[in-house]
Amino acid sequence: MILADLTTPAGIEKLVQVTGGTQSYYNHPERADGIATVVQQAITANPNLAHVKVRLMPNLPNAFYNYDRGEIILGVVNPDALAHELGHANNLRQEGLYRKILNAANGVARINNVVALPAMLALRMFVQDPERRDDILKSLSAVSAAIAAPGLLEELSASTTAFQHAPNKLRAVGTLGPAFMAHMATSMMPSAIYQAGRP
């Protein structure tokens, strides 16, 4: 399926069938008509988006943009969530320095998320000088925040785009706000871990 298929009744029907008709926090089958509107607006603004691949996933309680494959993974009927992912697709389908920086930062951030706690614990155990340990942890915290910044800015950009195009701003905040806060918590966790390890 490609994005343009979600402007047709058949595409919308398939989305609802695959993702399930039950309502949950993110899944709102009764808002299916809003999907076509969001997609049409995005394609009108950037016709290249019409050919973005869309993979429908049952039992996925959300949606995301797969940077590596350039496709939207959609598991919910939610125009606001889709508009957010379309923001990513619009930003990241443009080749260039932005995408390279974002991919590199995301790769380093994933590694940092795994090593932050063991690194902090190792520093607490093996670096006996409190001032030196504090300087190292403070530096690691700052570097971690800098590494997280490009990903957070991309999330903010996609959420802002989705909010601007949302017909119901309050409902959009209810969808986009918690998702952004979850991204921020995950992204800033290594920085917080290094801060927590300071004397």
Language-model regions, residue ranges each:
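Hydrophobic secretory-pathway targeting helix
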Residues: M1-A10, S139-A142, A148
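Catalytic phosphate/metal-binding cores of nucleic-acid and nucleotide-processing enzymes, i.e., regions
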Residues: E71, G75, L102, A109-I111
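Coil-to-alpha-helix initiation sites in intrinsically disordered, low-complexity, charged segments
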Residues: E95-R99, N168-R171
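Long, well-structured alpha-helical subdomains associated
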Residues: N106-L156, T160-P199
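ATP-binding/phosphotransfer module of carbohydrate and carboxylate kinases, centering on a glycine-rich
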Residues: K53-R55, Y98-L102
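Active-site recognition of the HExxH zinc-binding catalytic motif
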Residues: D80-G96
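Short acidic linear motifs
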Residues: G11, A83, E131-D135
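Auxiliary, metal-adjacent structural segments of Zn-dependent hydrolase domains
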Residues: I2-P79
